[in-house]
Amino acid sequence: MEVRQGANARDVKGYDTERLRNDFLIQNLFPADDFKLVYSQIDRIIVGGCMPVNKELTLEAGSELKAAYFLERREMGIFNVGGNGSVIVDGTEYKFKYRDGLYIGMGSKEIKFKSEDSSKPAKFYFNSTPAHKTYPTVFIDPEKDIKDEFKLQLGSVEGCNKRLNRKYILPGQVETCQLEMGITTLEPGSVWNTMPCHTHDRRMEVYFYFEIPEEDIVVHYMGEPTETRHIIMRSEEAVISPSWSIHSASATHAYAFIWGMAGENQDFDDMDWVDMKDLK
């Protein structure tokens, strides 16, 4: 597990491209038959991924957590962005197709991942945050289980930002201690997300971009509103966004992204909007 320290806005505005990428960008999230785990000291979120191909994978706590098992003091949300597969939680198997999700509450001891077909392996992306209480484990099929009020059609064709935001893990849909996750999908011809942009001092966020053709890129915007920076990203990469940073993107092709948040306020609308004229 890689551990990354927090970052403050005064320092970050002096970072060069390499430093920005080293501190905030997460690549190679789906190693074959292994895990990629990044522990960010920003709100103690863990960003991870795995791709079981020839064997079943078991998630271990490792020395970094100083815990008997991974979810001893944590909760997590898992999404599948590959072929069909399964997650087994303390002996209960949850079968995933593409874009299915799962919330696992604190205290679950054994978490295993496997693919249905090794030639089309599942790709499991997940976020994990500290927890103080056990909530029920919940499987989420986006076509069947997400309530209408948690499916938001946003943007417009004229604004090149028409998109559907599905809130998978959020109070009222799935109860958690602090973790919130969902998927936003841009329609063909739309390339902007979250513009006008915002920050939220009470939460940090991680974006995971996917469904981007190999020859295309996403330009992720970050930094304070008056000190913006960018990171060039490609499909199946994630980026850490501190609470003081904007988090927005444009791209050379439509795309989707999984958003995950950690912090003290689960009110999704608790955002500090930034007027376009104030951006620099």
Swiss-Prot record:
Biological role stated in the UniProt entry: Catalyzes the isomerization of 5-dehydro-4-deoxy-D-glucuronate to 3-deoxy-D-glycero-2,5-hexodiulosonate.
Any one GO biological process: D-galacturonate catabolic process
Cofactor note: Binds 1 zinc ion per subunit.
Superkingdom of the organism of origin: Bacteria
Keywords: Isomerase, Metal-binding, Zinc
Keyword Transport among record annotations: no
Catalyzed reactions: 5-dehydro-4-deoxy-D-glucuronate = 3-deoxy-D-glycero-2,5-hexodiulosonate
A Pfam family this chain is assigned to: KduI
EC class: isomerase
Protein encoded by which gene: kduI
Name of this chain's protein: 4-deoxy-L-threo-5-hexosulose-uronate ketol-isomerase
Pathway(s) this gene product operates in, as recorded in its UniProt entry: Glycan metabolism; pectin degradation; 2-dehydro-3-deoxy-D-gluconate from pectin: step 4/5
